[in-house]
Protein backbone atom coordinates (compact mmCIF):
# COMPACT_ATOMS: atom_id res chain seq x y z
CA UNK A 1 0.00 0.00 0.00
CA UNK A 2 2.95 2.27 0.60
CA UNK A 3 3.88 1.81 -3.02
CA UNK A 4 0.51 3.19 -4.02
CA UNK A 5 -0.94 -0.24 -4.67
CA UNK A 6 -4.62 -0.65 -4.14
CA UNK A 7 -5.61 -3.16 -1.47
CA UNK A 8 -6.59 -6.53 -2.82
CA UNK A 9 -10.11 -7.65 -2.25
CA UNK A 10 -10.75 -11.18 -1.06
CA UNK A 11 -12.90 -12.92 -3.63
CA UNK A 12 -15.27 -15.77 -2.69
CA UNK A 13 -16.52 -18.50 -4.93
CA UNK A 14 -20.16 -17.41 -4.80
CA UNK A 15 -21.65 -20.42 -6.63
CA UNK A 16 -20.00 -22.81 -4.18
CA UNK A 17 -21.20 -20.77 -1.21
CA UNK A 18 -24.78 -20.72 -2.47
CA UNK A 19 -24.67 -24.44 -3.17
CA UNK A 20 -23.65 -25.15 0.42
CA UNK A 21 -26.40 -22.91 1.77
CA UNK A 22 -29.04 -24.52 -0.45
CA UNK A 23 -27.88 -27.96 0.58
CA UNK A 24 -28.18 -27.03 4.24
CA UNK A 25 -31.67 -25.65 3.70
CA UNK A 26 -32.72 -28.77 1.84
CA UNK A 27 -31.36 -30.94 4.63
CA UNK A 28 -33.28 -28.92 7.20
CA UNK A 29 -36.51 -29.01 5.23
CA UNK A 30 -36.08 -32.72 4.65
CA UNK A 31 -35.65 -33.34 8.35
CA UNK A 32 -38.76 -31.30 9.11
CA UNK A 33 -40.75 -33.18 6.47
CA UNK A 34 -39.63 -36.55 7.82
CA UNK A 35 -40.57 -35.48 11.32
CA UNK A 36 -43.99 -34.30 10.18
CA UNK A 37 -44.60 -37.47 8.16
CA UNK A 38 -43.50 -39.62 11.07
CA UNK A 39 -45.77 -37.75 13.46
CA UNK A 40 -48.75 -38.02 11.13
CA UNK A 41 -48.16 -41.72 10.59
CA UNK A 42 -48.54 -42.29 14.32
CA UNK A 43 -51.61 -40.09 14.71
CA UNK A 44 -54.59 -42.17 15.91
CA UNK A 45 -57.93 -41.46 14.26
CA UNK A 46 -60.87 -41.49 16.68
CA UNK A 47 -64.13 -42.97 15.38
CA UNK A 48 -67.38 -42.34 17.20
CA UNK A 49 -69.74 -45.30 17.65
CA UNK A 50 -73.22 -45.01 19.15
CA UNK A 51 -74.42 -48.41 20.41
CA UNK A 52 -78.13 -48.88 21.13
CA UNK A 53 -80.45 -51.43 22.67
CA UNK A 54 -83.78 -50.88 24.35
CA UNK A 55 -83.09 -53.47 27.04
CA UNK A 56 -81.39 -52.42 30.28
CA UNK A 57 -77.66 -52.66 30.89
CA UNK A 58 -78.19 -55.61 33.27
CA UNK A 59 -79.52 -57.87 30.48
CA UNK A 60 -76.92 -60.55 29.73
CA UNK A 61 -76.26 -59.65 26.09
CA UNK A 62 -76.07 -55.91 26.85
CA UNK A 63 -73.80 -56.42 29.83
CA UNK A 64 -71.44 -58.57 27.79
CA UNK A 65 -71.42 -56.06 24.94
CA UNK A 66 -70.00 -53.61 27.46
CA UNK A 67 -67.71 -56.08 29.22
CA UNK A 68 -66.55 -58.17 26.25
CA UNK A 69 -67.34 -56.77 22.80
CA UNK A 70 -66.11 -53.22 23.35
CA UNK A 71 -62.85 -54.14 25.17
CA UNK A 72 -62.07 -56.72 22.47
CA UNK A 73 -62.46 -54.15 19.71
CA UNK A 74 -60.31 -51.68 21.64
CA UNK A 75 -57.65 -54.31 22.19
CA UNK A 76 -57.42 -55.23 18.51
CA UNK A 77 -57.32 -51.66 17.27
CA UNK A 78 -54.66 -50.75 19.83
CA UNK A 79 -52.30 -53.27 18.22
CA UNK A 80 -51.79 -50.99 15.21
CA UNK A 81 -52.66 -47.72 16.87
CA UNK A 82 -54.28 -46.44 13.69
CA UNK A 83 -57.78 -46.11 15.10
CA UNK A 84 -59.54 -45.67 18.41
CA UNK A 85 -63.27 -45.97 19.08
CA UNK A 86 -65.21 -43.36 21.02
CA UNK A 87 -67.99 -45.56 22.40
CA UNK A 88 -71.31 -44.02 23.37
CA UNK A 89 -73.61 -46.66 24.85
CA UNK A 90 -77.34 -45.97 25.08
CA UNK A 91 -79.46 -48.70 26.65
CA UNK A 92 -82.68 -49.14 28.56
CA UNK A 93 -84.89 -46.95 26.39
CA UNK A 94 -82.56 -43.94 26.28
CA UNK A 95 -82.84 -43.76 22.50
CA UNK A 96 -85.12 -46.68 21.56
CA UNK A 97 -87.38 -49.21 23.25
CA UNK A 98 -86.62 -52.96 22.92
CA UNK A 99 -88.77 -53.24 19.79
CA UNK A 100 -87.26 -50.11 18.25
CA UNK A 101 -83.64 -51.12 17.64
CA UNK A 102 -84.17 -52.30 14.05
CA UNK A 103 -85.81 -49.01 13.09
CA UNK A 104 -83.31 -47.01 15.13
CA UNK A 105 -80.33 -48.46 13.29
CA UNK A 106 -82.15 -48.09 9.97
CA UNK A 107 -82.68 -44.37 10.60
CA UNK A 108 -79.18 -43.81 11.96
CA UNK A 109 -80.25 -43.12 15.54
CA UNK A 110 -77.50 -45.55 16.44
CA UNK A 111 -74.47 -46.87 14.57
CA UNK A 112 -74.36 -50.37 16.06
CA UNK A 113 -77.31 -52.18 17.60
CA UNK A 114 -78.43 -55.43 19.17
CA UNK A 115 -81.66 -56.19 17.32
CA UNK A 116 -84.18 -58.47 19.01
CA UNK A 117 -85.29 -60.28 15.89
CA UNK A 118 -88.35 -62.05 17.31
CA UNK A 119 -90.20 -58.72 17.24
CA UNK A 120 -89.82 -58.43 13.47
CA UNK A 121 -91.15 -61.61 11.89
CA UNK A 122 -92.55 -59.77 8.86
CA UNK A 123 -89.33 -57.86 8.08
CA UNK A 124 -86.89 -60.59 9.14
CA UNK A 125 -88.76 -63.86 8.46
CA UNK A 126 -85.68 -66.04 7.98
CA UNK A 127 -84.47 -65.14 11.49
CA UNK A 128 -87.25 -67.33 12.91
CA UNK A 129 -85.49 -70.54 11.84
CA UNK A 130 -84.70 -71.75 15.37
CA UNK A 131 -87.99 -70.54 16.82
CA UNK A 132 -89.82 -72.46 14.09
CA UNK A 133 -88.10 -75.70 15.12
CA UNK A 134 -88.81 -76.24 18.84
CA UNK A 135 -87.84 -79.35 20.79
CA UNK A 136 -84.67 -79.86 18.74
CA UNK A 137 -81.66 -78.44 20.60
CA UNK A 138 -81.27 -76.90 24.03
CA UNK A 139 -77.67 -75.74 23.59
CA UNK A 140 -77.16 -72.05 22.84
CA UNK A 141 -73.70 -72.62 21.38
CA UNK A 142 -74.86 -75.17 18.82
CA UNK A 143 -77.86 -73.11 17.74
CA UNK A 144 -75.84 -69.88 17.44
CA UNK A 145 -73.21 -71.57 15.29
CA UNK A 146 -75.79 -73.28 13.07
CA UNK A 147 -77.77 -70.08 12.48
CA UNK A 148 -74.65 -68.08 11.65
CA UNK A 149 -73.55 -70.76 9.19
CA UNK A 150 -76.97 -70.60 7.53
CA UNK A 151 -76.59 -66.82 7.28
CA UNK A 152 -73.26 -67.27 5.51
CA UNK A 153 -74.37 -70.11 3.21
CA UNK A 154 -77.67 -68.53 2.16
CA UNK A 155 -77.97 -64.84 1.23
CA UNK A 156 -81.50 -64.48 2.60
CA UNK A 157 -80.71 -63.45 6.18
CA UNK A 158 -78.18 -60.81 5.25
CA UNK A 159 -80.41 -59.51 2.45
CA UNK A 160 -83.27 -58.96 4.90
CA UNK A 161 -81.08 -56.69 7.02
CA UNK A 162 -79.76 -54.92 3.93
CA UNK A 163 -83.35 -53.93 3.12
CA UNK A 164 -83.41 -52.35 6.58
CA UNK A 165 -80.33 -50.26 5.75
CA UNK A 166 -77.98 -52.30 7.92
CA UNK A 167 -75.19 -54.84 7.76
CA UNK A 168 -75.45 -58.23 9.51
CA UNK A 169 -72.49 -59.08 11.74
CA UNK A 170 -73.49 -62.11 13.82
CA UNK A 171 -76.40 -63.83 15.48
CA UNK A 172 -76.87 -64.06 19.21
CA UNK A 173 -78.36 -66.88 21.28
CA UNK A 174 -78.74 -65.63 24.82
CA UNK A 175 -80.79 -68.44 26.31
CA UNK A 176 -80.07 -72.08 27.02
CA UNK A 177 -83.68 -73.14 26.43
CA UNK A 178 -87.19 -71.82 26.85
CA UNK A 179 -89.10 -73.04 29.90
CA UNK A 180 -92.59 -72.32 31.24
CA UNK A 181 -92.90 -70.19 34.40
CA UNK A 182 -96.26 -70.14 36.17
CA UNK A 183 -98.24 -68.57 38.99
CA UNK A 184 -99.59 -71.99 40.01
CA UNK A 185 -98.13 -75.53 39.89
CA UNK A 186 -97.88 -77.05 36.41
CA UNK A 187 -97.00 -80.69 35.78
CA UNK A 188 -98.57 -81.55 32.43
CA UNK A 189 -100.23 -80.08 29.34
CA UNK A 190 -103.64 -80.32 30.98
CA UNK A 191 -102.49 -77.71 33.50
CA UNK A 192 -101.91 -75.23 30.67
CA UNK A 193 -105.27 -75.79 28.98
CA UNK A 194 -107.56 -72.77 29.02
CA UNK A 195 -104.85 -70.45 30.35
CA UNK A 196 -103.02 -67.39 29.06
CA UNK A 197 -99.30 -67.47 28.35
CA UNK A 198 -96.98 -64.52 27.82
CA UNK A 199 -94.49 -64.88 25.01
CA UNK A 200 -92.94 -63.14 22.04
CA UNK A 201 -92.90 -63.87 18.35
CA UNK A 202 -92.95 -67.42 17.05
CA UNK A 203 -93.01 -69.08 20.48
CA UNK A 204 -96.63 -68.06 20.92
CA UNK A 205 -97.41 -70.64 18.24
CA UNK A 206 -96.19 -73.41 20.55
CA UNK A 207 -99.54 -73.09 22.32
CA UNK A 208 -101.69 -73.87 19.29
CA UNK A 209 -101.95 -77.56 20.08
CA UNK A 210 -102.98 -76.99 23.70
CA UNK A 211 -106.75 -76.82 24.20
CA UNK A 212 -107.96 -73.34 25.08
CA UNK A 213 -104.50 -71.92 25.69
CA UNK A 214 -103.98 -68.38 24.43
CA UNK A 215 -100.77 -66.51 23.84
CA UNK A 216 -100.35 -62.90 24.92
CA UNK A 217 -97.59 -60.96 23.21
CA UNK A 218 -95.12 -59.11 25.39
CA UNK A 219 -91.47 -58.32 25.90
CA UNK A 220 -89.10 -59.75 28.47
CA UNK A 221 -89.27 -56.58 30.54
CA UNK A 222 -93.10 -56.84 30.58
CA UNK A 223 -93.46 -60.41 31.83
CA UNK A 224 -93.13 -59.67 35.55
CA UNK A 225 -96.03 -57.21 35.52
CA UNK A 226 -98.09 -59.34 33.15
CA UNK A 227 -97.99 -62.26 35.58
CA UNK A 228 -98.26 -60.11 38.71
CA UNK A 229 -101.41 -58.36 37.52
CA UNK A 230 -103.05 -61.60 36.38
CA UNK A 231 -103.04 -60.63 32.72
CA UNK A 232 -101.42 -64.03 32.10
CA UNK A 233 -101.02 -67.25 34.06
CA UNK A 234 -97.65 -68.26 32.61
CA UNK A 235 -94.67 -66.84 30.74
CA UNK A 236 -92.22 -68.50 28.37
CA UNK A 237 -88.65 -67.44 29.06
CA UNK A 238 -85.40 -68.95 30.27
CA UNK A 239 -83.85 -69.36 33.75
CA UNK A 240 -81.11 -66.73 33.40
CA UNK A 241 -83.70 -64.11 32.44
CA UNK A 242 -86.00 -65.36 35.20
CA UNK A 243 -83.20 -64.73 37.68
CA UNK A 244 -82.33 -61.32 36.24
CA UNK A 245 -85.93 -60.09 36.21
CA UNK A 246 -86.92 -61.76 39.53
CA UNK A 247 -89.66 -63.88 37.99
CA UNK A 248 -89.75 -66.22 41.01
CA UNK A 249 -91.53 -63.47 42.94
CA UNK A 250 -94.60 -63.69 40.70
CA UNK A 251 -94.23 -67.06 38.93
CA UNK A 252 -92.71 -69.49 41.47
CA UNK A 253 -93.29 -72.67 39.43
CA UNK A 254 -91.12 -73.69 36.49
CA UNK A 255 -92.00 -76.56 34.17
CA UNK A 256 -88.73 -77.84 32.73
CA UNK A 257 -89.94 -78.69 29.22
CA UNK A 258 -86.66 -77.85 27.43
CA UNK A 259 -88.52 -76.30 24.51
CA UNK A 260 -85.25 -75.29 22.90
CA UNK A 261 -82.65 -72.59 22.39
CA UNK A 262 -83.56 -69.84 19.96
CA UNK A 263 -81.61 -67.15 18.17
CA UNK A 264 -83.22 -63.88 19.20
CA UNK A 265 -80.48 -61.26 18.84
CA UNK A 266 -78.45 -60.00 15.91
CA UNK A 267 -75.63 -57.46 15.96
CA UNK A 268 -76.05 -55.05 13.07
CA UNK A 269 -74.42 -51.85 11.82
CA UNK A 270 -76.04 -48.94 10.01
CA UNK A 271 -75.14 -49.38 6.33
CA UNK A 272 -73.99 -45.81 5.74
CA UNK A 273 -71.87 -45.87 8.88
CA UNK A 274 -70.37 -49.20 7.82
CA UNK A 275 -69.40 -47.93 4.39
CA UNK A 276 -67.46 -45.04 5.96
CA UNK A 277 -65.47 -47.28 8.28
CA UNK A 278 -61.83 -48.15 7.49
CA UNK A 279 -61.23 -51.78 6.51
CA UNK A 280 -59.23 -52.40 9.67
CA UNK A 281 -62.19 -51.41 11.84
CA UNK A 282 -64.63 -53.45 9.73
CA UNK A 283 -62.43 -56.52 10.11
CA UNK A 284 -62.25 -56.05 13.88
CA UNK A 285 -66.03 -55.70 14.16
CA UNK A 286 -66.65 -58.84 12.09
CA UNK A 287 -64.17 -60.95 14.04
CA UNK A 288 -65.25 -59.74 17.47
CA UNK A 289 -68.93 -60.20 16.60
CA UNK A 290 -68.30 -63.92 16.11
CA UNK A 291 -66.28 -64.09 19.32
CA UNK A 292 -69.09 -62.27 21.14
CA UNK A 293 -71.60 -64.77 19.70
CA UNK A 294 -69.72 -67.72 21.18
CA UNK A 295 -68.91 -65.86 24.39
CA UNK A 296 -72.54 -64.99 25.14
CA UNK A 297 -73.79 -68.46 24.19
CA UNK A 298 -71.15 -69.98 26.45
CA UNK A 299 -72.18 -67.79 29.36
CA UNK A 300 -75.83 -68.70 28.78
CA UNK A 301 -74.95 -72.37 29.11
CA UNK A 302 -72.54 -71.87 32.00
CA UNK A 303 -75.13 -69.91 33.94
CA UNK A 304 -78.05 -72.21 33.21
CA UNK A 305 -77.64 -74.39 36.30
CA UNK A 306 -76.67 -71.48 38.52
CA UNK A 307 -79.76 -69.61 37.33
CA UNK A 308 -82.00 -72.55 38.12
CA UNK A 309 -80.42 -72.79 41.56
CA UNK A 310 -80.98 -69.06 42.07
CA UNK A 311 -84.61 -69.46 41.02
CA UNK A 312 -85.08 -72.15 43.67
CA UNK A 313 -83.26 -70.06 46.27
CA UNK A 314 -85.66 -67.20 45.51
CA UNK A 315 -88.61 -69.45 46.35
CA UNK A 316 -89.19 -71.17 43.04
CA UNK A 317 -90.02 -74.83 42.41
CA UNK A 318 -88.88 -76.76 39.32
CA UNK A 319 -90.79 -79.75 37.94
CA UNK A 320 -89.40 -81.91 35.13
CA UNK A 321 -91.89 -82.50 32.35
CA UNK A 322 -92.56 -86.16 31.64
CA UNK A 323 -90.88 -87.18 28.33
CA UNK A 324 -94.18 -88.53 27.01
CA UNK A 325 -95.87 -85.22 27.78
CA UNK A 326 -93.04 -83.36 26.08
CA UNK A 327 -93.43 -85.49 22.96
CA UNK A 328 -97.19 -84.97 23.06
CA UNK A 329 -96.66 -81.21 23.21
CA UNK A 330 -94.35 -81.26 20.17
CA UNK A 331 -96.72 -83.47 18.18
CA UNK A 332 -99.77 -81.38 19.07
CA UNK A 333 -98.39 -78.33 17.28
CA UNK A 334 -98.97 -77.62 13.61
CA UNK A 335 -95.77 -78.04 11.61
CA UNK A 336 -94.73 -74.43 12.03
CA UNK A 337 -91.33 -75.20 10.50
CA UNK A 338 -92.93 -76.37 7.26
CA UNK A 339 -95.15 -73.29 7.22
CA UNK A 340 -92.12 -71.07 7.80
CA UNK A 341 -90.21 -72.73 4.96
CA UNK A 342 -93.14 -72.58 2.53
CA UNK A 343 -93.70 -68.89 3.16
CA UNK A 344 -90.09 -68.19 2.25
CA UNK A 345 -90.26 -70.56 -0.74
CA UNK A 346 -93.32 -68.74 -2.04
CA UNK A 347 -91.44 -65.45 -1.75
CA UNK A 348 -88.65 -66.82 -3.93
CA UNK A 349 -86.31 -67.55 -1.03
CA UNK A 350 -84.71 -70.93 -0.19
CA UNK A 351 -86.87 -71.70 2.84
CA UNK A 352 -86.88 -75.48 2.45
CA UNK A 353 -83.13 -75.78 1.75
CA UNK A 354 -82.45 -73.57 4.78
CA UNK A 355 -84.65 -75.75 7.01
CA UNK A 356 -83.01 -78.95 5.77
CA UNK A 357 -79.52 -77.53 6.25
CA UNK A 358 -80.30 -76.25 9.74
CA UNK A 359 -81.74 -79.55 10.96
CA UNK A 360 -78.78 -81.43 9.45
CA UNK A 361 -76.31 -79.16 11.24
CA UNK A 362 -77.92 -79.82 14.61
CA UNK A 363 -78.10 -83.57 13.96
CA UNK A 364 -74.41 -83.52 13.09
CA UNK A 365 -73.81 -81.67 16.36
CA UNK A 366 -75.41 -84.56 18.24
CA UNK A 367 -79.01 -83.39 18.77
CA UNK A 368 -81.90 -85.71 18.02
CA UNK A 369 -85.17 -83.79 17.55
CA UNK A 370 -88.31 -84.80 19.40
CA UNK A 371 -90.08 -84.08 16.13
CA UNK A 372 -88.30 -84.07 12.77
CA UNK A 373 -89.77 -80.97 11.21
CA UNK A 374 -87.70 -81.18 8.02
CA UNK A 375 -88.55 -84.84 7.33
CA UNK A 376 -92.26 -84.11 7.69
CA UNK A 377 -91.90 -81.16 5.35
CA UNK A 378 -90.18 -83.34 2.74
CA UNK A 379 -92.87 -86.01 3.05
CA UNK A 380 -95.56 -83.46 2.33
What annotation goes with each model-predicted range?
Residues 38-43:
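Sec/Tat signal peptide C-region and signal peptidase I cleavage site
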Residues 1-19:
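Short, Lys/Arg-enriched N-terminal segments with co-localized hydrophobic residues
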Residues 12, 16-17, 44-144, 152-380:
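N-terminal secretory/targeting leader peptides
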Residues 29-37:
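Hydrophobic alpha-helical targeting segments used for export or membrane insertion
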Residues 18-29:
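Bacterial N-terminal signal peptides that target proteins for export
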